[in-house]
Amino acid sequence: MNLINFSYLNLLFGAGLFSVLESATILNTESDAKKWLTTYNDEAGKYIYDATEAEWNYNTNLTDHNLGISIKKSNDLATFTEQKAIEANKKFVWKNFTDPLLKREFSKITDIGTASLSDEDFQKMSGLNSDLTKIYSTAKVCNKPNDPSGKCYPLDPDLSDIISKSNDLEELTWAWKGWRDASGKHMPDKYDEFVQLLNKAANINGYEDNGDYWRSWYESPTFRKDCEDLWQEIKPFYEQLHAYVRRKLQKKYPQIAFPKEGHIPAHLLGNMWAQSWENIEYLLRPAPDLPSMDITEELVKQNYTALKLFQLSDTFFKSLGLIQMPQPFWEKSMIEKPADRDVVCHASAWDFYNRKDFRIKQCTVVDMHWFMTTHHEMGHIEYYLHYKDQPISFRSGANPGFHEAIADIASLSVATPEYMQSVSLLPNFTDDPNGDLNFLMNQALTKVAFLPFGYLIDQWRWDVFSGDTPRPKYNSKWWHNRCKYQGVYPPVIRSEQDFDAGSKFHVPNNTPYIRYFVAHIIQFQFHEALCKAANNSRPLHRCNIANSKEAGKKLAELMKSGSSIPWPKVLENLTGSEKMSAKSLMAYYKPLIDWPEKRKPRAENWMGGKMSSWIV
């Protein structure tokens, strides 16, 4: 679930529209500006390619040598970026241009992010970012209970496998606590220094703090309120789902004294961060006598490999009439974890900005999770492929959430029983209302369970950036948010010696996270519009757009524009509305929302519940 494939370009380039560099001193025509942009795009593409290639080499082989090259190339890019922004402001009164597209391109070129820092500060910031990412990517947990081998376990696949499959409470607690001790606990001082530098760059560029800068990418003064309104719209559904899951877990683990406030122990939900709950679907199936929707067993039975998962994903996108993966993709992607070196395993999609080199990096395991992840990452590549002919400044999603939503479009179709059966991966599905409920529950455990987590991470970071959450309160505020929004609590006592936010990749890697919350809302708007284009006659949750060239045409039109058009207009072109809305999501899940068992009232109110006993 990660479009931002490397840290330095994420640091360098935002999507904001604010320029703070020198006022123009020489008046040139818009014709001159277009000629200047031609040269700029050629030069920028080369610098970005070099920085991206160096960062790829480091991510796929975590050595000090590769890190040194990567920092050097990112510094070169930062210098180029700053120089060109200054030049653009000196040569052109671009804010007075009459061509809105030309003005938009210049506004992006002159909004340079952390490239505005001094060379010394930029190098310090780059080094801190690399240090934080390396701590995360090389962390291992040792001393597993009842394991005399002395083996140390990395997150992927080992600790993730334990959290997702084990029923042993001692083992689950060991993995949960051990991961946080090995990763986040080593980060807070470095992270605090990193935050100060990010804020310094934001201030130079005219923003109140780095959170203000990140929010500017959505080009809306009401963005924060809009997100809160969306959360309030879907919160009752999440509360119902949470209460149902809690009741089931209480039955499974009677030896645990669940807190009276109504929270769930975070290590019992089948995911290291409790961000999705599909791994405990077997406990939660509305019709438990029917077969599981999990296709892992079938994938293994049919001898699927990582490569075969990628080929199947490529076939799905080709069936829509979209662009197939180019040959360099197959030659250069890292689709399995190497045995001979440390790498950043977190799945990511990469655009090398030369219109021909696009790659995925992930440590694939043959199971349903990676089946879905592969389609997600390839969705990012499709977006790259479709906007590759845009100018450099427009080679991004209409807003950051669009990229993640497009990446998830495939998942809403390939998860359907119809698609699974069409590729012979779900031979025993029962097509009746109970089977439907099982399917929707599985989808909700993946997508609805994620929503508060997708919302809370940047709520926490924005408060860190603004100073509302100072260093001595990092961990207590983190658990305040997790308690308030997710309704989970830690299985062991936490303190300010811990830094549990750092146990999630996107925090040390400095990848903004609110995009995933936005994406998990608007992907259902996209899906509904594409299903209409495909003349779908089934309920929205059973719509499968595979093989629909009309749906593919609509999707391609959206992707081709990149960020050249303000996102509300792009949304309106596809859906008929320029507003983000949860109505399509609620329509998708209506049979599950109306299911009587899930609608049992809950006795507790954990939203905002006390958590003082969990933090010392």
From Swiss-Prot:
GO cellular component, one term: extracellular region
EC number, as in UniProt: 3.4.15.1
Residue ranges annotated for the Peptidase M2 domain, each copy included: 27-610
Gene Ontology molecular functions: carboxypeptidase activity; metal ion binding; metallopeptidase activity; peptidyl-dipeptidase activity
Tissue spec. comment: Epithelial cells of the midgut.
Listed GO biological process terms: proteolysis
Binding annotation for Zn(2+): 376, 380, 404
Active site: 377, 506
PROSITE patterns in alphabetical order: PEPTIDASE_M2
Cofactor list: Zn(2+); chloride
Activity regulation: Activated by chloride. Inhibited by captopril and lisinopril, and to a lesser extent by delaprilat.
Note on cofactor: Binds 1 zinc ion per subunit. Chloride.
InterPro entries associated with the record: Peptidase_M2
Predominant subcellular localization, coarse grouping: secreted
SUPFAM superfamilies: Metalloproteases ('zincins'), catalytic domain (SSF55486)
Domain of life (superkingdom): Eukaryota
Signal peptide: 1-23
Reaction catalysed by this enzyme: Release of a C-terminal dipeptide, oligopeptide-|-Xaa-Yaa, when Xaa is not Pro, and Yaa is neither Asp nor Glu. Thus, conversion of angiotensin I to angiotensin II, with increase in vasoconstrictor activity, but no action on angiotensin II
Residues holding chloride 1: 180, 478, 482
Family statement: Belongs to the peptidase M2 family.
Protein name (Swiss-Prot/TrEMBL): Angiotensin-converting enzyme
